[in-house]
Design a protein with these regions (language model features):
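Conserved class I S-adenosyl-L-methionine
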Residues: 66-75
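Conserved SAM-binding motif I beta-strand of class I
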Residues: 92-99, 104-111
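C-terminal substrate-binding/active-site "lid" region of AdoMet-derived donor-dependent transferases
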Residues: 142, 153, 175-267
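Local beta-strand N-terminus motif with an aromatic residue
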Residues: 66, 165-168
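A short helix->loop->beta-strand "cap" motif at the edges of active sites that frequently abuts
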Residues: 89, 103-105, 209-212
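N-terminal auxiliary segments of SAM/dcSAM-dependent transferases
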Residues: 1-22
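S-adenosyl-L-methionine
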Residues: 117-166
Length: 267
């Protein structure tokens, strides 16, 4: 049985203190600005940071000693993944050499918007300098259009281009449902009553190694679509309190390299 570590719920005061101790008070201050309303779905500016979400993402990566992150979308989460992987890199860069991980302490960001990708990239570079991170995680940025498609006769979306990697942590927070090209029989996600429906994870499922974690930020309909169409054995938690859907691959170990990888996570 493959298990993962779930971060404990913390109150707002604890989380604010956590970020302040990381010299990230600016994120705490920005998080208190106004957030968009439920029907304000097409935004011209980047979202303000959500402290609770960011704290939990940081802890998921740290507690489970992730090595390679694939992020659908970009934003403040990209910065947090960078900080978490950079911390793990300092602690485990030598030990990782014994594993079959060819992109250790690297992040692959897949974004539809050149504008928001540039914002995320500049933000990460700014904080790397501000926090004097000498050897940060390596980040690969890929811009790709998204189109409507069919998977098992279900209408959904797919990216036209995906970066080559095999992550052990996948964060699903993109694309924006309005950044999708064409339609299928007149249907697309470009309507406020529709919802995101990414299919790319399903197409890559058989490449993932046991122990791989997927976190969906909200996107409950997309999480259900994944759950109903996965072929391998995935454990699933619907975390309503934090509006997250967590999957991890609890499949039979593939061989000695996968076994060593799982042992690294648990030590």
């Amino acid at each position: 049985m493959i298990n993962i570590k779930i971060p404990k719920n913390k109150n707002d005061k604890f989380i604010e203190k956590f970020f302040i101790q990381k010299n990230l008070k600016i994120i705490v201050d920005l998080s208190k600005k106004n957030k968009p309303s439920v029907n304000e779905m097409v935004l011209s500016e980047a979202y303000m940071p959500d402290l609770k979400d960011l704290y939990r993402l940081y802890q998921y990566v740290l507690l489970n000693k992730r090595t390679t992150i694939f992020e659908f979308g970009s934003g403040w989460s990209t910065l947090i993944f960078n900080l978490a992987l950079s911390e793990l890199k300092v602690k485990f860069s030598k030990k990782i050499n014994n594993l079959r991980r060819n992109n250790p302490f690297e992040i692959f960001v897949l974004e539809t918007s050149k504008k928001f990708m540039k914002i995320s990239k500049n933000r990460v570079n700014h904080f790397n300098k501000l926090l004097e991170i000498k050897n940060p995680a390596k980040i690969h940025y890929t811009q790709s259009d998204v189109e409507m498609t069919l998977l098992n006769q279900n209408i959904c979306t797919q990216y036209k281009k995906i970066p080559l990697c095999n992550p052990d942590f996948i964060y699903l927070d993109g694309p924006d449902q309005f950044d999708v090209k064409n339609d299928i029989k007149g249907i697309s996600t470009r309507h406020k009553d529709m919802m995101p429906m990414v299919s790319d994870i399903l197409k890559l499922e058989y490449f993932y190694t046991p122990g791989t974690i997927i976190i969906c930020d909200g996107r409950g309909a997309n999480a259900r679509f994944l759950k109903d169409n996965f072929k391998r054995k995935w454990e699933y938690i619907c975390d309503n309190k934090n509006d997250q859907h967590i999957f991890w691959l609890n499949d039979p170990i593939l061989g000695k390299h996968n076994k060593a990888q799982l042992e690294f996570y648990d030590k």
